Amino acid sequence: MSSSPIFEMWSEAFKETAEAFGMTADTFFCDDSDEAWRNRIQQCAQDGYDGLLVSHGGVDYAWEFLSGITAAYPDLKIATFDTSFRDKNGDTQKIDGVVQLFQRDSGLAAALVEELLSMYPDKAEKEGPVNILQVQEENYIIAFDRRQVGYELYETVGKIKTLEQIAPEDHLNPVSSMQEVAERTIRQYEEGEIDAIWCCYDAYAQGVYQALRELGSDIPMVSVDICDEDIQFMAEGLNWKACATTNWTLNGEFACRVLALEMAGQYDDIEAASCYYKSLGMWMEIPSVVITQEQIMSGQDITIKNLSAVADASYTDQSWMPSCDWMTAALGS
C-alpha cells in the first residue's frame, strides 16, 4: 500500500479487526515501489507470518511472483487488493487459495454517469446524448480499465457521447499537469458544447477543478475516489458535484475478514458473501457509494474520517461482507 489517508484508515480498521479475532497485524507501506513490495512480501514470508493482505501489485509481475511465494511457503495464506493476475501473454490467471479483492470499479464509473444524466434529464431521455469530456487513461492502470467498462455501457446505448479523452502528460505532477491539459482542451470548445466532465481518478479531478475555476467555467464534474482535498473542493458548492467511492474503514475490516477465513480454511463462508463472484472464482468486489456535493454541504468540517455523518445508509452497510458464527461473536455484528 501507499501511505495515503485512505490506506491509513484501512490499516487501522484491519488491525482493530485482527485484534478482535485474537490475532496481531502489522502494516508495511511500500509507497508505490514495486521493488519494495516484492522485497517486503519475501521478508514477511521468511519471517513466518501466517497470512498476508497485499495491495496494488503490478500486473506485469504479481501473478508470477506470488505464485512463487505460495509454492515456497504452502502454509502461508494470501489475499490481494487491486491486484490482477496475468501471465506474460496477458492472459488472466488464478492462484489456488488466493482471494482477489477489488472495488466495484465498473459500478463506481456507472454511478457517476447516472449522476451526470440526472443533471440533464430532458437531454438524456429526448434530445440525444449528454456530451462528456472524459478524463481517462486506458491501458495504464487496471482499475482505470475496469472503470472504463462501466462508462462505456452508457456510450453503447447512446445516453452519452465522449467528446474527447484527456489525461495528464506528467505523471510525476498529475494535478498541475492535468490542470494545464484541461485548460488547453476546454478553451477549444464553445460554451455549452461540453455538458459535463467525468474523471477516472480524483487526483486528476483536482487538476480539472482548478482549471475550471481558472477559466470561470460552470461545467459540472464528477470523479472516482475521494480524499479530504476533494471534500474541501466539493464544499465550495461549485463544479465538483459528486465522488464515487467505497468506505475505507469498512474496506480494512472486509480484507481482514477474508484473510481470517482463508487462514481458518473456511472458503465456503467467503463464497457465501453477496460480493463474491462465483463466475470469476476467488474474486470479490466492494460495492460503490456516491457522495454528493449536497451531502458534503449539509454538514460541517466533513472529512473522510467522519463522512458517515452525511453519507446515506449504503456507506455504512456491512451486509455484503463474509461472516460466520465465531466472526459475528468476535465483532458483535
Where does each model-flagged region fall?
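Extracytoplasmic "Venus flytrap"
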Residues: M1-T17, F21, D26-I41, Y49, ...
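Hydrophobic alpha-helical segments within soluble ligand-binding/sensing domains
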Residues: W37, V99-V130, F144, M178-A182, ...
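Hinge/cleft segment of the Venus flytrap/periplasmic-binding protein
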Residues: G128-Q136, F254-S333
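Hydrophobic alpha-helical
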Residues: R38, D50-Y73, I78, G150, ...
